[in-house]
């Protein structure tokens, strides 16, 4: 067991890291274009932050959190998602006193004790954005557009934007009563998890993917869009109107409720149907009570999160290659102790000039070192042996063109720039 990563986790090896860099750099670039600034919050938070915001009876809190008691007898939890920590950060640092709205993005690992499967891990990575301090429907559309632009920048197509409104405290209670009455005669046909959801928050039954529950829900289930108050209905209509004006196609999904208690009004997901059961690439919505729930003043918010592992799965299916491996500039080959010492000085000079370079310190033969230079896929090899040292020169070989240059050591810096560019 000591030689294996824990179940549900995954090592990222050097040959894979360039894909991750591409995902992260694209996220940063798109976020900056939209005026978002990066925030970083702790890997673990007080457990109460999640029980109060995400919902004590939600699947995340009741089944999936990694919670522990520290030596100070405090209950702490590895963050299962990023919105609640972002809201806590907003309150703790009194950012409600700054000009509103404030716009953040974050990238980092999250943790949930979930059943590992394709694209789903117990330690996974999310890119998310949050906007605090705006009630306007334009803000909802802006974060949706940012998410769609992110996918487009990665080359993903064939995606669908699903949309719904989950109402607010004022209009949701009547809907929950109707939904509870509707499910009352169907409780024998729903799974055990949904029975628990039925007792605490019947809306979550709509989110179940199990066939028995989908059949129990049926086509006659009450839809929340028919119970929205005037404010929520107007907001939802405006969101749809703006999406249409931007030529952004969407599908109304009346069963889209998201799995977290803090959502209000707009809820959305971007899905890739060809992925199968785990087709959601990312999603989010509005959370107008979350900041207040975290101890701050009443402050509206909206945001999304997207799973990077799920995106990599989608890219693989679409055969989109994000490899952006930076090529090594120089591979140093030296034979003999004096030559090695001189080569080590030149190695430092090359790096100071901004070129990447490695040197074989293992005292292999010239032939063995040349093989390693080829395997390293370097642009140039620099060769320094006794003969070159006696002549105060070195040999630089263009590994692609096969051309070789003799470079005097006294003009090394100038010639390196000419040769390597």
Swiss-Prot record:
Q: What is its EC number?
A: 6.1.1.21
The chain's disulfide connectivity reads: none
Q: Does the keyword Nucleotide-binding apply?
A: yes
MF GO annotations:
ATP binding; catalytic activity, acting on a protein; histidine-tRNA ligase activity; transferase activity
Query: What InterPro entries does the record point to?
Result: aa-tRNA-synth_II, aa-tRNA-synth_II/BPL/LPL, Anticodon-bd, Anticodon-bd_dom_sf, His-tRNA-ligase, HisRS-like_core, HisRS/HisZ, HisRS_anticodon
Compartments annotated for it: namely: Cytoplasm
Q: Which PROSITE patterns match?
A: AA_TRNA_LIGASE_II (PS50862)
Q: What's in the keyword line of the UniProt record?
A: Aminoacyl-tRNA synthetase, ATP-binding, Cytoplasm, Ligase, Nucleotide-binding, Protein biosynthesis
Q: Which reaction does it catalyse?
A: tRNA(His) + L-histidine + ATP = L-histidyl-tRNA(His) + AMP + diphosphate + H(+)
- Known CDD domains for this protein? HisRS-like_core, HisRS_anticodon
Q: What is its main location?
A: cytoplasm
Domain of life, per lineage: Bacteria
Pfam families per UniProt: HGTP_anticodon, tRNA-synt_His
* UniProt enzyme class: ligase
What NCBIfam families would the database entry show?
hisS
- Please state which protein family the record places this protein in: Belongs to the class-II aminoacyl-tRNA synthetase family.
Q: What is this protein called?
A: Histidine--tRNA ligase
Species of provenance = Natranaerobius thermophilus (strain ATCC BAA-1301 / DSM 18059 / JW/NM-WN-LF)
What gene does the UniProt entry assign to this protein? hisS
